[in-house]
Amino acid sequence: MGPQARTLCLLSLLLHVLPKPGKLVENSDFHLAGDYLLGGLFTLHANVKSISHLSYLQVPKCNEFTMKVLGYNLMQAMRFAVEEINNCSSLLPGVLLGYEMVDVCYLSNNIHPGLYFLAQDDDLLPILKDYSQYMPHVVAVIGPDNSESAITVSNILSHFLIPQITYSAISDKLRDKRHFPSMLRTVPSATHHIEAMVQLMVHFQWNWIVVLVSDDDYGRENSHLLSQRLTKTSDICIAFQEVLPIPESSQVMRSEEQRQLDNILDKLRRTSARVVVVFSPELSLYSFFHEVLRWNFTGFVWIASESWAIDPVLHNLTELRHTGTFLGVTIQRVSIPGFSQFRVRRDKPGYPVPNTTNLRTTCNQDCDACLNTTKSFNNILILSGERVVYSVYSAVYAVAHALHRLLGCNRVRCTKQKVYPWQLLREIWHVNFTLLGNRLFFDQQGDMPMLLDIIQWQWDLSQNPFQSIASYSPTSKRLTYINNVSWYTPNNTVPVSMCSKSCQPGQMKKSVGLHPCCFECLDCMPGTYLNRSADEFNCLSCPGSMWSYKNDITCFQRRPTFLEWHEVPTIVVAILAALGFFSTLAILFIFWRHFQTPMVRSAGGPMCFLMLVPLLLAFGMVPVYVGPPTVFSCFCRQAFFTVCFSICLSCITVRSFQIVCVFKMARRLPSAYSFWMRYHGPYVFVAFITAIKVALVVGNMLATTINPIGRTDPDDPNIMILSCHPNYRNGLLFNTSMDLLLSVLGFSFAYMGKELPTNYNEAKFITLSMTFSFTSSISLCTFMSVHDGVLVTIMDLLVTVLNFLAIGLGYFGPKCYMILFYPERNTSAYFNSMIQGYTMRKS
C-alpha cells in the first residue's frame, strides 16, 4: 500500500470516528445554501495552549475558549463578499454561492473541518483510484488564519487539489508548491514582512534590538527569518532573544512561567536596547503586556508582527501608551463600502435554498457571544480600516472570478455544471482582476502581491487607532514613508536604540564583544581613508599617487612637484647653461679659425674639438632636467651627461699625461713614447674610458630601470615628487665616483707638469678645472646622501652645469684670451723660444 493510499484510509477512518454532522440550524451565520459551496475556516475562539486535547480523539468545543473579535469580523467579511457576489449581475449571473464556515479555535480544531469539507454529503470519503471526478462538499476553502493550521489543512486538501486560499498565513513554507500545490494566499509571505521591519529599523537607525518569540512554529520560523535577514547586513544586531512563556487558557500563569517572564523583563530593563520585536500570537501577549505595565516600562519601541499588529483587545489596554511607541506590519488598508453596517446586522438574506445542495451542520458552528462582543468593538474596527478584512474579501472574489471563467459566464447567465476542484484551481491561478482599485493576481508562488503598511497605534479614538506611517511594496521591495510618527518620548524625538553611536566620517569601527553593532570608533590616520560601503572596520591605504588627511573618507591626488621654468633655481641654472652654451660656441669658432696656430695645437689640437662638441651638446640638453620627468629625460640624466663629462675629463687627463711625457719621459723612455704616439695613444685612452663609462651606464640601466616614478615627499606627504627611478641616484653616485678618479688623475699629471714652459704649463688651469670638478662631485654625493626630492634634481643640474663651465672656461678660456689679446705669443718663434729657455734651465 502506497503513502497516498494509507493517507486516504486514515482520513476515511477519521471521518467515521469523529462526531457526525448535526441538525441544520436555520438562522446560523455559518451556513448559506447555494449552487456551489465555499468552505471557510476562521478563529472565533482560541485556546492559548492548544495541545491539551490532542492526547485523545475528541473535537474540542471552541466556544469554551476565549473569543477573538477579529476572527468573527473576518468571517463576516466572507459572508459579506458572498452576498455581494450573489447580488451582482455581472459576476456569476444566475449562480448562487453558498458557504460552510467552521470555527477552528486557532490550532485546536484543524483536522475535523478539513475532513468535513473533504467528505461528500453522506459524510463518506470513498477510496478511489482516480479522484479527478470526485466532488467534495465544497469547491474551495478560504482560510485558516495562521500558518500552522493552514499547513495542517493543506496537507489534507492538497491530495485532492481542492483550492485553499488563506488570508493571513504568511509562512514561507507555503510557497513550496511541491508540498502545497493547491495553497494560495492573499497576503505577502513572511519574508516581505521581515524585510519591511528591517527597512523600518534601518530608516530610524535602530541597530540594537531585542527579539521576543512565542514557543511555537510561528515564533520560531519568523525569528529564524529575521536572523537570516540580519546576517546579510551588519547594521542591526540582536541584543538578546527570549521565548515568551505561554499561559494556560485561564491566563493565570504558573510560578515557573512567572519566573521565566520575570527573568525576561529583568533583562529587558537592564539592556540598552530600546526596540523590541515581538513574534507571537496575540493571545500569548495579554499576560506579557500586563506584566510590562506592572514593571512600569517606558520609552520602548514595540514592533508587532502581523499576528497582533491590529489586535483590538490588546489595543484596548490604553495604559500601554505609557510604555512607549507601538509599530506594526500589516496588510494595506482598503475600505469596503457597506461592510461596517453588515457586520452588526443580525438577519440573514432570504435566498431560496437550491435543491443541488444539502445543508448540514458540524461541530463548532456557533458563537452566541460574537455579535454582542463585535458591536462593543465596532467603533475601533471601523476606524482601523478593516485591514485583514480585505484579504478575506479578495479571496472570495478570486474564487468567484475563477468560477465565472470556468462556467463560461456572459453578462446574463452561466452554464451550471459540475465543477471539480482541480478545474477551479487551474482557473484561480490565472485570475487577474481589479477590486476596489487594486489589481489582484497570484504570482508563481501563489502569493497575491498586496502592499504592506507600517502602522502606529494611536489611542485618540477620534483618529484611526492603527495609523499608517509607511507602505512597503513586495514588488519593488522598498519602503515608502508617507507620514511622520508621533513618538511617545519627550519632545517627540526618535528613540535611540544603538549599542554604539555611529562613527563620524573617516572613523573606522573596532568591534567590542561579539556583536558587530558594538564597537568603538578610531580615527583613520593620514594616508588612509574609510570606505564604509567596502569595509567599515578597516582604514584603507591610499594609492601611491594619492594622499589623505586624518579622518578622510576619500583620497586626493598629491600635488606633483618637479623642476619648473618659473622657479628661481631653474632660472639661475638656465642662465648659466646659456652662458656655457654660447661661450662654448664662441670657443669652438675661435679654435676653428686658429686651428693651425701653436696655441691651439698646444691645447690638444683635434682633441680640443673632441672636448668642445660634447660640452656644446651637454649645455644644449640642460632643458631635459626641467618639467615632468620622462623616460627620455631620465635616460639623458643617467647616460648622456655623464658620458659627455667623462669624455671631457679623459681628454684633459690624457692631454696632461701627454705633455708630461713629451718633456720628462720621452728622453728616458723613447721607445714607449714612440709606441704611444704611433698607435694614437691619446685617442685610444679616450675611447677606452668612454667605452667603460658606456658599459657602466648600460649595465646600470639593464639592471634597474630608467622609468620615472612618483615618490612621497618625506617632509610634506601632500606632495608627490616626480623624479627618475631611485636607482638613478645609485647610478649617479657610481658614475660620479669614476669621474672623481679621472679628476684626480688629471690633477696629478697637471701637477707633475707645473715646471714646464709657460706655454705648455697648464697645471693651474687644469688644477682649477679638476679641483672644481672634484669638489662639486664630492658635494653632490654628500648632498644626495642627506636630501631627497626636487632639491637633488636641482643640485644635480647645478653641479653638471658648473662642471662643464669649469672645463669650458677654466681650460679653454685662458687660451682664447691669449689668442685674441696676445697674438704675438701665438707664434712658432715664441713657442720655440720658450722651449729653449726651459731646456737651458734644465741643462
Swiss-Prot record:
Segments in the Extracellular topological domain: 20-570, 628-642, 704-731, 786-789
Membrane topology (Cytoplasmic): 592-606, 664-682, 753-764, 811-843
GO biological process: detection of chemical stimulus involved in sensory perception of sweet taste; positive regulation of cytokinesis; sensory perception of sweet taste
Subcellular location: Cell membrane
Transmembrane segments: 571-591, 607-627, 643-663, 683-703, 732-752, 765-785, 790-810
InterPro entries in UniProt: ANF_lig-bd_rcpt, GPCR_3, GPCR_3_9-Cys_dom, GPCR_3_9-Cys_sf, GPCR_3_C, GPCR_3_Ca_sens_rcpt-rel, GPCR_3_CS, Peripla_BP_I
Subunit: Forms heterodimers with TAS1R3.
PANTHER family: CALCIUM-SENSING RECEPTOR-RELATED, TASTE RECEPTOR TYPE 1 MEMBER 2
Family under the similarity heading: Belongs to the G-protein coupled receptor 3 family. TAS1R subfamily.
Protein name per the record: Taste receptor type 1 member 2
Species of provenance: Rattus norvegicus
